[in-house]
Amino acid sequence: LCDENTKILHRNTEDSKMDVSVIGTVYPFELLSPNEKKVVNTVEKINLTLRTYTSGYLRFEQDSYMGGNSPWPIATLWMALYYIKSGNRKKALECFEFVTKSATKLGFLSEQVDNKTMKPNWVIGLGWSHAMYIITLAEILKK
């Protein structure tokens, strides 16, 4: 769903808040090319609205789950996969390193990361975050 005026992808026609899940149009679904203008515009907007000062990414604008404003490893890995597909290895590694540094001593990933401490926050040991981490690592190693 692309806004014809801004050329930015949105999660639906009723809501113009940015949502990192629209990157799914590039990966894994490959409906759009990572370098299409509407995708590039969307990524620029995601970086303005969802990227935190610690380099992690929020899920969507005004996300209030558990207080909001905490980056999600899964969202950050999704951005890493976008950057891999777009050929920006440096940014992909930056996202991947953020997630790696936020893991517990045993390597478990959390649902969110505390921006102040960079420690795992909330639920720890999520299958989807670990699966996305492995997928991202495999993609990094391919390049």
Describe each region flagged by the PLM:
Residues 1-72, 94-143:
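Extended glycan-interaction surfaces of carbohydrate-active proteins
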Residues 67-87:
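Internal helical hairpin/lid segments
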